[in-house]
Amino acid sequence: MPSEQDIASIPHTLLGKQRLASLADENGDIDSALLAFQWEMDARRTLLAPAGIAEIALRNAIDQEISNWWHNNSFPGTWTDKNIPPEATILKPFVHPTGWEKRASKNLSSKNRPVNHCDLIAHTSFGTWKNMIGNPIAINKNPPTEKKKLDSWNAAKQRDKECALLWKNILFSAFPNIPGRAQRGKISPRAYIGARVSRIAALRNRMFHWDNLTALDIKMRYRDINEVLSAINPLLGTWLDSSYESEINQLIDDKPSWLKPYLSKK
């Protein structure tokens, strides 16, 4: 049986001195740190399902529109095939069938059939779709003076041009219900979706890498998810709220009072 001293050391072993200090109340109470850590665990569990739903809806909506465009142009096969015709070069910067096939093959439940298009789509990363849309408002309008930073800025600008072209020709139709200018402000429809998808991606990374969630604005990140789903189909946003909004609100209410206030980044 572990001794009382062994049991007392568990929080330090689990979280480390710095993490304990960041979670504890103003008195540095160990029990308060463990309670805060449990809230973080609950936050991950509560946010995971909505974030997963957003990923599934996003990839299916984009795949559907690219597939429609592909077939409307009478291209052979599917857009995830290795040989993209010259007329479809707009997709080349974003399509990586060899890597997708390797990932899908590893996770295929049955090894007795070849990997198909649906398998590839199901096993893509969230970043695949985020990178197709881009996030234009994240790119500084003014080029930096330092050469290394300027090279990165130029590469980001070029990539964003490719995203803008893909959006203009195909992806815009995956989000037919983006709010009008009066609601979304001065940003473009692509920027509206891109900013939200990028924040959802950052949220996923924080959850999966076990980063600190105490400063996260839970309400705003859930709102990002809802707004992306609603832009695809308003019924998705309504269904999400009916399934998860009360749990999200309860999570916010249950946040320990001594934790840092939210850092709201819209």
What do these predicted ranges mean?
Residues 1-203, 208-218, 223-266:
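Amphipathic alpha-helical interface elements
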